[in-house]
């Protein structure tokens, strides 16, 4: 996985101060960025030139305070062929020595009016998501009441049909058939569609449907956090399914675990409504409202009262 410099420019709306077309095609392979503070003093041990170099007010002020020849020399040491680009934040004026060094070393110089901390956060978040290792899973990813719900199950059980019904009920399709999932951080999973399948859903007997064309832009979403997994399986009278919601099960992807529930599919059951309820119930639990715990408390209280009455 890699990101091109021109993609970063487009995403963060950066201005190009210097950058030939071929320089904007440079690949970025590391999500980390560097704010070169010590490097400007001449200390280059552990310097990582493969990262994007971000200069804020502190770095810029120190650079401007240096004599012109020293400024040029330190920038020449910083700007190496493997450096993807240099970004100057806060709309600060790029020194002539920086432009000279960039031309000689063939490195794009970019600027942004955004504050350094904000720009750093946006850039890191974007690179983390783009460069994260993807895991492809079979299923349908839906945005239900603002929650990312991954619907899985055996082939032919009705995942896509359920997704289409959820779209008709006002929810949004993120991905059908193949969902590319990546860990945005240690506790968060995100999912997105394969580019070739974006906004498309396959219904047996009908064919491929362009959800955006049929239902509008409000019916689709380019990516979503994956917060809950729902596994559809055929109803089996010999199998016990969770009736109280107290049997915790998890799905682990890329080292991150999310809760998973199993829903038996049976003729006459409205699976889309059940999944809606599951999503709302999960959100209620996250907010501290647990119906299972409430039922358990009521049952315990009832048993205690009966014991007192029968004593």
Curated annotation (Swiss-Prot):
UniProt cofactor(s): Mg(2+)
Residues that bind Mg(2+): 160, 202
Keyword Metal-binding: yes
Alphabetical list of Pfam families matching this protein: Hpr_kinase_C (PF07475), Hpr_kinase_N (PF02603)
Cell wall biogenesis/degradation among keywords: no
Source domain of life: Bacteria
Stored InterPro entries: HPr(Ser)_kin/Pase (IPR003755), Hpr_kin/Pase_C (IPR011104), Hpr_kin/Pase_Hpr_N (IPR011126), P-loop_NTPase (IPR027417), Ser_kin/Pase_Hpr-like_N_sf (IPR028979)
Region listing for Important for the catalytic mechanism of both phosphorylation and dephosphorylation, in residue ranges: 201-210
Gene3D superfamilies reported in the protein's UniProt record: HprK N-terminal domain-like, P-loop containing nucleotide triphosphate hydrolases
GO biological process terms on file: regulation of carbohydrate metabolic process
PANTHER family in the cross-refs: HPR KINASE_PHOSPHORYLASE (PTHR30305:SF1), PROTEIN YJDM-RELATED (PTHR30305)
Quaternary state and interactors: Homohexamer.
Family from the record: Belongs to the HPrK/P family.
HAMAP family, A to Z: HPr_kinase
Written domain comment of the UniProt record: The Walker A ATP-binding motif also binds Pi and PPi.
Name of the protein in question: HPr kinase/phosphorylase
Record lineage: Bacteria, Bacillati, Bacillota, Bacilli, Lactobacillales
């Amino acid at each position: 996985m890699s990101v091109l410099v021109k993609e970063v420019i487009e995403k963060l709306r950066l201005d190009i101060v210097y950058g030939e077309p071929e320089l904007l095609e440079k690949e970025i392979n590391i999500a980390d960025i560097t704010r070169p503070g010590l490097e400007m003093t001449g200390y280059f041990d552990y310097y990582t030139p493969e990262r994007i170099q971000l200069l804020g007010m502190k770095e810029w002020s120190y650079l401007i305070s240096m004599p012109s020849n020293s400024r040029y020399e330190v920038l020449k040491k910083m700007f190496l062929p493997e450096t993807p680009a240099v970004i100057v934040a806060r709309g600060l004026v790029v020194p002539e020595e920086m432009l000279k060094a960039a031309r000689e070393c063939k490195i794009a110089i970019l600027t942004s009016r955004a504050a350094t901390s904000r720009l750093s956060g946006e850039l890191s978040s974007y690179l983390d998501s783009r460069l994260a290792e993807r895991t492809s899973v079979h299923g349908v990813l839906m945005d239900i009441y603002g929650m990312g719900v991954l619907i899985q199950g055996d082939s032919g059980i009705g995942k896509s049909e359920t997704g289409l019904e959820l779209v008709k009920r006002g929810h949004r399709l993120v991905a059908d058939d193949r969902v590319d999932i990546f860990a945005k951080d240690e506790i968060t999973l995100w999912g997105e569609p394969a580019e070739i399948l974006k906004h498309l859903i396959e219904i047996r007997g009908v064919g491929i449907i362009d959800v955006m064309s049929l239902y509008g832009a409000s019916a689709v979403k380019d990516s979503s956090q994956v917060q809950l997994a729902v596994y559809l399986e055929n109803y089996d009278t010999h199998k016990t399914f969770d009736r109280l919601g107290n049997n915790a099960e998890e799905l682990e992807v890329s080292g991150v675990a999310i809760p998973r529930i199993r829903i038996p599919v049976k003729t006459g059951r409205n699976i889309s409504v059940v999944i809606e309820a599951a999503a709302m119930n999960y959100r209620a639990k996250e907010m501290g409202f647990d119906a299972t715990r409430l039922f358990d408390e009521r049952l315990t209280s009832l048993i205690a009262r009966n014991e007192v009455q029968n004593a």
